[in-house]
């Protein structure tokens, strides 16, 4: 094979590594984040395995070597020398090439391998490197012998293109019969080269340093130079052949990194003295070795070398030049330390848990320190522990013999003896946290008594052995194992710990990502199996980003266990620069796949007399190795009894994805057979994220069947590539994801098709239709993203010789009918090409719409009850998905693990989100505790405070869904109408400063919510009727039945004595789209009152503090579709003022007008804002007034001054206290840094105990602890401080930010939101401090899609997700929620966000006017133009935005 493109030297070496068909490539670096010194290697050897220098890489490689596979290793001399013990154990019969970069110029590493029997080639220039690369691979494959190739990349160069044709050989790996002898394979090599020198020279320099060319250019006429090209085999006869007979002195030069302190002969010099007799016969008088460091004056070095060798007694330990500690090496060390510190920050997720649980009782025996790296290894820490143990044993021994009061000349003698006896009883026991505290209090008291009673020899003996109180203290002792700074070579430290049976704990952190699992055979997770076989060790496998609760349990159990404990902790990262979010995603994939199972093994319970099991499985999937262990120990049956679903999970985890794929295809074929069709086959495959492509494919297949074709329809994920050529007629339909990417269920197929060069599709007829949006990426340079998957697929199929039935079809969302415009032309051409265009076809049923689903649902019942009982799937049908929204439930799946489950042949990990209806945003401590409990037992362990001041419980499995809703209703909190095409939760201002006004608007919120609550009895019937086995309390059904308000329990009696459901306001099809009310109280607009369908601005009499009425705004709404100019956000328009006592009828009129005039055909045009614009504000107002029978009064004046929450304590006019706690993005959870969920639970318990206070939720996703009397403020403050809820010292930007849920649970999200925004703000806070903006409030919003849940279009600064890792940056929103923003920059990548925002903040800091807000500033200085009205949202966007 000839190189057609110009390659650099590292790329050429990588190209050689693939010379044999079966090959493996490994390369090592100092950190995960750093690139190989063989620059460009990864671009050629794309499947190369990356290993770290400090993790014994040769041990990993050694286990993967095979005589049938050509293996190449790229490393450096330091890593190689450290692995020399592995090199000696390498078998001879291996095709292995180890290419070594002498990056420290330390050529002494080469003679260090002199006793190996393997060829060693040395390259000091480009041509030699090319020649030796060729030779090394030919020798390795022909003789089955490992070969070492040393070169100096810095000297030769890594970036210069090689401008010559290289014939890369295709090598066959020899076998025992065909292999040649090593001597034959190496015989033709040029071992030595006389670079310069005539027959008359008297001295020759043998150079083993990087300076061949430099030294040869300054040699005196009587001196020659020989360079070494092949060091092993050492062929001294070839050396003598080129050595001029006139030479009497040999100066050997060896490149080293620093001067040696040893005077011993160097190994390289011994090569010459090994042939001493031949030297004597050639009249060689002197052989002297000189070590060469970093050299600049080459002539001076040569003169010094020659002068030294001509002395009668030359210096045999001469070192010339400078130690080779270059700036680059210093930079590498600095980078290494920096990388390790970044890893330590990631590992803090575990270390903080230890510190929180054990605080002053924690002892970490080895910790990272950049100054003293060596003592951080586990062996050192264990040695330190053993020393402490020996001292403790001596102390115990003395205490046991000192229990006689007469030994103490003190009145405290009896007390000392009693305490010593008690202290002794604590030794050798399992101590829980309380016992640990008691034991340490006892030890401290003993030491204090001994110090104050030093009148006896016994006391002096104690103080000699135990000079400090620490000697009496009981610690939870931990060793930390880290891939970055505390690597346990061969797990020797673990073996010592287990063998010792000492009471010590090991936290072993594994950083290997799931997708690298095949690269490393020596996995830490397997240490768990090894440790469990000891039967005397506690073992746990944990993952902080998978199950925080399980981690806490394991750490506590490990510390309590009296013996060795091994806690395997997962923290996967691909780079030291990875964020916690990236670690979280990797963790979820590994746990879900079963690669990293969560479990605990406690030998204390490995006893038939106990009713507990020694092994506890905390995740649902385990792999074969762990299963085999359990089978062998006969514990699997116990596990299965405890968790009946386990056996099914085990079977799933062991299944083969290909088998499942074939089963699915077989079913499709069987269905086709049952139809008894006689026409030609048509296989329809789709790739779809949002469902459009899938629905279109299913519709096409149905139409094909109606025309007599044998049609099947499957996801592209179900294609078996090898069977594709025989499928005759195939249609591919794909939507477009991200930046022109295939949807999730098409990626695997596309990668396989793209990389298969042998596939012949000449017998296949194909058609392709794509769904895209030509304006989604508006920039000219991004236009190629439009329908890129379908276009790429069509070209690839043609390249593989497939025959196109019809031209490629490209659907465009910008067309009048969306993708249907192009599809309606494309489909008839397909029928014509297949010869069925004239077939008689019955009228096709119209597609089922949401309006159909509502109409046929029997007042929101559908088949929800039946679906809940169906255990064959974790999800529900599409129709029930839509109906369950009316019940406050959204179907979700964990998108972080969607791909890994797909690869296993499993359906998405379906789960549900339950949203509470909470008018007024007010909740009791009983309700909070119930939600907290439900989130732990049925949800994902967190609570979400939403941007509409209510709760969401995420991660509820279908089997727990009814229990969750019943648990909420048991505390009089329902979910009816929390979503769906009805009025949803009514949000009101939190208003902690004014109790009287807040009570009025809270009452109004409840009145509106109750008035517009659906009157169907379906909710009660489906979720609440009768008792359930899962009920926590038998009284639940009676609570449901006796509740006076909430969901209706009985149907309405109509004529004919029939009991039916009636919806007097909504009717049987409810509203065209969702509908919301907000209530604001000037000067506070913390609910963004103009952003919603109906906004009520309370007009308060300043003297009486009575709400006299409301200004009514209609037509607000945030939802849009990217680049679809028919959709836009809109602020509400004022219809006028209405008195408080008259408010319900006009509100009902607004709902009725929307019900009757809203667009029920196009859901993207169905919100009230479009109805108002279509009818005109005045036209809409007239319709409402017609229904109401009255006129709106003129709008009353008001002024907003604030849009944010105010944090900390405040007292209202009644004397009650309120504390607003900062809950970032509304996610209430326990983390190592912020145990907020536990803290708020403690607050709720305190409220319940003292009968004081309640909670309020704010529209900015924060929490107000309300109505606390003065006597209980101190108690609440203590709890807040303990659980870090009292911290409000955040930047103004962070305090003013909010975010939607986004990935991974929201099905609409294109990009990260809640999990990413805190990281962005953290990156910005340094510059805020620098610019003097730390305390300035800037409204920042972030969403994963354009639907607007966090009201991003009102943000002064907003990021709206457009594709994975891609956002639109919006600027210019009004600080008071009074103005929409506008697009500033489209398609901003994750890593670009901060770079775009920083200059804006800097300019704002320098040029703003007094009191000017950021959004106003952006408009005043012309950074962005104002959005004057929603319908003009897409206008006046700068061309630079795209």
From Swiss-Prot:
Residues bearing PTM Phosphoserine: 903
The Flavodoxin-like domain, residue ranges: 682-831
UniProt subcellular location: Cytoplasm
Cellular component terms per the entry's GO annotation: cell periphery; cytoplasm; cytoplasmic stress granule; fungal-type vacuole; sulfite reductase complex (NADPH)
InterPro entries named among the record's database cross-references: Flavdoxin-like, Flavodoxin/NO_synth, Flavoprotein-like_sf, NiRdtase/SiRdtase_haem-b_fer, Nit/Sulf_reduc_fer-like_dom_sf, NO2/SO3_Rdtase_4Fe4S_dom, NO2/SO3_Rdtase_4Fe4S_prot, NO2/SO3_Rdtase_4Fe4S_sf
EC class: oxidoreductase
Superkingdom classification of source: Eukaryota
Names of the cofactor(s): siroheme; [4Fe-4S] cluster
Pfam families per UniProt: Flavodoxin_1, NIR_SIR, NIR_SIR_ferr
Residues binding [4Fe-4S] cluster: 1300, 1306, 1345, 1349
Keywords: 4Fe-4S, Cytoplasm, Heme, Iron, Iron-sulfur, Metal-binding, NADP, Oxidoreductase, Phosphoprotein
Note on cofactor: Binds 1 siroheme per subunit. Binds 1 [4Fe-4S] cluster per subunit.
Catalysed reactions listed for this entry: hydrogen sulfide + 3 NADP(+) + 3 H2O = sulfite + 3 NADPH + 4 H(+)
Pathway participation: Sulfur metabolism; hydrogen sulfide biosynthesis; hydrogen sulfide from sulfite (NADPH route): step 1/1
Protein EC: 1.8.1.2
GO terms of biological process kind: hydrogen sulfide biosynthetic process; sulfate assimilation; sulfur amino acid biosynthetic process
Entry's family note: Belongs to the nitrite and sulfite reductase 4Fe-4S domain family.
Other observations noted: Present with 2900 molecules/cell in log phase SD medium.
Assembly mode: Alpha(2)-beta(2). The alpha component is a flavoprotein, the beta component is a hemoprotein.
Functional summary from the UniProt entry: Catalyzes the reduction of sulfite to sulfide, one of several activities required for the biosynthesis of L-cysteine from sulfate.
Protein's recorded name: Sulfite reductase [NADPH] subunit beta
Organism of derivation: Saccharomyces cerevisiae (strain ATCC 204508 / S288c)
Lineage: Eukaryota, Fungi, Dikarya, Ascomycota, Saccharomycotina
Gene for this chain: MET5
């Amino acid at each position: 094979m000839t190189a057609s493109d110009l390659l650099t030297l590292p790329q050429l070496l990588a190209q050689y590594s693939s010379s044999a068909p079966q090959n493996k490539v490994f390369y090592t670096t100092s950190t995960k984040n750093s690139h190989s010194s063989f620059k460009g290697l990864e671009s050629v050897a794309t499947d190369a395995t990356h290993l770290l220098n400090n993790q014994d890489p040769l041990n990993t490689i050694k286990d993967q070597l095979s005589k049938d596979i050509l293996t190449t290793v790229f490393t450096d001399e330091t890593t190689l020398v450290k692995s020399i013990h592995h090199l000696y154990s390498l078998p001879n019969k291996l095709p292995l090439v180890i290419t070594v970069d002498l990056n420290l110029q330390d050529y002494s590493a080469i003679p260090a391998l002199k006793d190996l029997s393997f060829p060693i080639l040395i390259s000091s220039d480009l041509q030699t490197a090319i020649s030796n690369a060729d030779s090394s691979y030919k020798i390795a494959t022909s003789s089955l012998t490992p070969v070492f190739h040393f070169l100096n990349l810095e000297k030769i160069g890594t970036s210069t293109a090689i401008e010559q044709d290289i014939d890369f050989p295709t090598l066959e790996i020899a076998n025992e019969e065909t292999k040649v002898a090593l001597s034959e394979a190496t015989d033709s090599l040029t071992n030595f080269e006389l670079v310069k020198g005539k027959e008359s020279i008297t001295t020759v320099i043998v150079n083993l340093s990087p300076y061949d060319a430099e030294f040869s250019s300054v040699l005196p006429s009587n001196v020659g130079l020989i360079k070494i090209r092949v060091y092993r085999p050492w062929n001294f006869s070839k050396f003598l052949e080129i050595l001029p007979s006139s030479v009497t002195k040999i100066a050997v030069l060896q490149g080293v990194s620093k001067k040696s302190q040893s005077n011993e002969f160097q190994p390289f010099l011994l090569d010459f003295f090994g042939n001493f007799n031949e030297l004597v016969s050639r009249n060689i008088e002197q052989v002297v070795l000189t070590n060469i460091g970093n050299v600049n004056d080459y002539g001076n070095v040569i003169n010094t070398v020659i002068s030294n060798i001509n002395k009668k007694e030359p210096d045999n330990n001469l070192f010339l030049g400078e130690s080779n500690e270059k700036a680059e090496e210093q930079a590498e060390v600095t980078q290494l330390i920096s990388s390790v510190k970044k890893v330590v920050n990631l590992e803090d997720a575990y270390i903080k848990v230890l510190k929180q649980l054990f605080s002053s009782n924690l002892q970490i025996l080895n910790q990272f320190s950049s100054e003293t790296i060596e003592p951080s290894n586990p062996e050192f820490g264990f040695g330190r522990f053993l020393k402490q143990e020996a001292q403790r044993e001596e102390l115990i021994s003395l205490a046991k013999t000192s229990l006689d009061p007469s030994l103490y000349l003190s009145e405290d003698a009896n007390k000392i003896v009693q305490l010593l006896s008690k202290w002794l009883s604590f030794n050798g026991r399992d101590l829980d946290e309380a016992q640990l505290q008691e034991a340490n209090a006892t030890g401290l008291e003993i030491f204090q008594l001994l110090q104050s009673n030093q009148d006896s020899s016994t006391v002096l003996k104690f103080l000699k052995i135990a000079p400090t109180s620490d000697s009496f203290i009981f610690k939870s002792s931990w060793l930390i194992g880290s891939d970055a700074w505390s690597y346990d070579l061969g797990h020797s430290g673990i073996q010592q710990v287990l063998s010792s049976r000492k009471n010590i704990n090991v936290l072993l952190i594994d950083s290997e990502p799931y997708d690298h699992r095949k690269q490393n055979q020596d996995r830490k997770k397997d240490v768990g199996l090894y440790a469990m076989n000891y039967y005397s060790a506690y073992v746990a496998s944990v993952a902080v980003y998978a199950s925080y609760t399980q981690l806490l349990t394991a750490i506590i159990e490990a510390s309590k266990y009296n013996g060795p404990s091994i806690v395997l902790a997962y923290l996967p990262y691909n780079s030291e620069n990875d964020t916690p979010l990236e670690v979280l995603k990797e963790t979820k994939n590994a746990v879900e796949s079963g690669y990293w199972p969560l479990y605990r093994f406690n030998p204390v319970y490995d006893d038939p007399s106990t009713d507990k099991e020694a092994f506890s499985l905390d995740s649902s999937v385990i792999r074969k190795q762990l299963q085999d262990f359990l089978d062998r120990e006969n514990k699997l049956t116990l596990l299965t009894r405890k968790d009946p679903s386990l056996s099914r999970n085990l079977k799933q985890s062991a299944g083969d994805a290909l088998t499942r794929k074939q089963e699915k295809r077989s079913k499709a074929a069987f269905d086709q057979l049952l139809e008894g069709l006689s026409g030609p086959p048509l296989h329809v495959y789709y790739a779809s994220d949002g469902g459009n492509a899938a629905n279109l494919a299913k519709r096409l297949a149905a139409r094909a069947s109606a025309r007599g074709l044998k049609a099947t329809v499957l996801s592209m994920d179900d294609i078996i590539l090898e069977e594709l050529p025989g499928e005759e007629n195939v249609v591919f339909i794909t939507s477009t994801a991200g930046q022109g990417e295939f949807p999730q269920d098409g990626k695997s197929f596309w990668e396989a098709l793209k990389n298969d060069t042998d596939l012949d599709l000449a017998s296949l007829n194909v058609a392709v239709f794509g769904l895209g949006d030509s304006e989604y990426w508006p920039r000219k340079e991004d236009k190629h993203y439009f329908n890129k998957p379908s276009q790429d697929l069509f070209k690839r199929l043609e390249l593989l010789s497939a025959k196109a039935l019809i031209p490629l079809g490209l659907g465009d969302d910008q067309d009048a009918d969306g993708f249907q415009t192009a599809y309606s032309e494309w489909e008839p051409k397909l029928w014509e090409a297949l010869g069925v265009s004239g077939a008689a076809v019955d009228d096709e049923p119209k597609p089922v719409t949401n309006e159909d689903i509502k109409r046929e649902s029997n007042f929101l019942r559908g088949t929800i009850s039946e679906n809940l009982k169906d255990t064959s799937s974790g999800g529900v049908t599409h129709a029930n998905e839509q109906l369950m929204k009316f019940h406050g439930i959204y179907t979700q799946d964990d998108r972080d693990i969607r791909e890994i489950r797909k690869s296993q042949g499993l359906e998405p990990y379906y789960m549900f989100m339950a949203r509470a209806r909470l008018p007024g945003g007010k909740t009791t401590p009983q309700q909070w505790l119930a939600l907290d409990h439900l989130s732990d037992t049925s949800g994902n362990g967190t609570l979400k405070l939403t941007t509409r001041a209510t709760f969401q419980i995420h991660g509820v499995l279908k089997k727990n869904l009814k229990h969750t809703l019943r648990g909420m209703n048991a505390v009089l909190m329902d979910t009816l109408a929390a979503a769906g095409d009805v009025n949803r939760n009514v949000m009101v201002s939190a208003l902690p400063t004014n109790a009287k006004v807040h009570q009025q608007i809270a009452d109004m919120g409840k009145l509106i919510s109750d008035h517009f609550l659906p009157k169907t009895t379906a909710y009660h019937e489906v979720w609440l009727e009768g008792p359930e086995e899962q009920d926590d309390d038998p009284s639940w059904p009676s609570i449901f039945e006796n509740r006076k308000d909430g969901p209706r329990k009985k149907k309405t009696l109509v004529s004919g004595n029939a009991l039916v459901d009636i919806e007097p306001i909504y009717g049987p099809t409810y509203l065209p789209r969702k509908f919301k009310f907000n209530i604001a109280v000037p000067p506070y607009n913390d609910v963004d009152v103009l952003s919603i369908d109906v906004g009520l601005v309370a007009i308060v009499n300043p003297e009486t503090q009575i709400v006299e009425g409301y200004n009514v705004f209609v037509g607000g709404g945030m939802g849009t579709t990217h680049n679809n100019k028919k959709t836009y956000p809109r602020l509400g328009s004022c219809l006028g003022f209405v008195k408080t006592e008259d408010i319900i009828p006009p509100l009902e009129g607004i709902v009725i007008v929307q019900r009757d005039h809203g667009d029920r055909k196009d859901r993207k045009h169905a919100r009230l804002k479009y109805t108002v614009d279509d009818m005109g504000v005045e036209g809409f107002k007239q319709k409402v007034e017609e229904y109401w029978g009255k006129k709106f009064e003129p709008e009353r004046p008001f002024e907003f001054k604030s849009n944010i929450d105010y944090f900390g304590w405040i007292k209202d006019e009644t004397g009650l206290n309120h504390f607003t706690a900062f809950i970032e993005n509304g996610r209430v959870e326990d983390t190592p840094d912020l145990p907020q969920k536990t803290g708020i639970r403690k607050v709720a318990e305190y409220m319940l105990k003292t009968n004081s206070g309640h909670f309020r939720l704010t529209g900015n996703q924060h929490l107000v602890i309300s109505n606390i009397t003065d006597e209980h403020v101190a108690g609440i403050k203590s709890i807040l401080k303990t659980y870090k809820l009292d911290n409000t010292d955040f930047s103004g930007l962070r305090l003013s930010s909010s975010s939607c849920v986004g990935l991974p649970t929201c099905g609409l999200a294109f990009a990260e939101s809640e999990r990413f925004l805190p990281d962005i703000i953290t990156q910005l806070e340094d510059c805020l401090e620098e610019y003097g903006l730390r305390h300035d409030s800037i409204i920042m919003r972030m969403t994963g899609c354009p639907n607007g849940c966090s009201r991003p279009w009102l943000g002064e600064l907003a990021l709206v997700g457009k594709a994975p890792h891609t956002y639109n940056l919006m600027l210019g929103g009004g600080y008071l929620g009074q103005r929409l923003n506008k697009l500033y920059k489209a398609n901003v990548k994750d890593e670009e966000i901060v770079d775009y925002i920083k200059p804006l903040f800097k300019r704002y800091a320098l040029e703003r006017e007094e009191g000017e807000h950021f959004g106003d500033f952006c408009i005043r200085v012309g950074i962005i133009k104002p959005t004057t009205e929603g319908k003009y949202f897409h206008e006046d966007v700068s061309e630079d935005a795209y």
